[in-house]
Amino acid sequence: MFRTETMTAGLKDYTKVRTLYENAFPPEERIPIRYLENGHQGNGDFIAFYQGDVFCGFFYLLTFGDLTNILFLAVEESLRGNGCGTRALQAIRSLKPDNRIILD
């Protein structure tokens, strides 16, 4: 079963999220992870996603009005090609059903 969990420093897989963030994006594309954790003044959603109990990846959304931008989306390298990214995008659509979604 695919599930999502809001990312916090106390999340069991916090270290995995942080490591994936650092490995999936080059330094010039990253912003300090503390900004993601703080949620951009209530406009951000930092979400880890799982297949059952297995950590698959994370996404970070920034929403203003009816516009949601996917700033970061990463899947664990060993799980790529198994539909986790597709399910993450479906989860985003479920979280923001009335919003236009942008993936840069």
Task: Write out the residue ranges for each language-model feature.
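Short amphipathic alpha-helix that is part of the acyltransferase structural core
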Residues: M1-I31
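Active-site rim helix/loop that mediates acceptor-substrate recognition in acyltransferases
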Residues: E22-Q51
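Secondary-structure boundary elements
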Residues: P27, S94-L95
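Short coil/turn segments at beta-strand junctions that form active-site/ligand-binding loops
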Residues: D45, D66, N99
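Conserved beta-strand in the GNAT
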Residues: A48, D53-T63, L67-A74
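Conserved GNAT acetyl-CoA-binding A-motif
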Residues: L95-D104
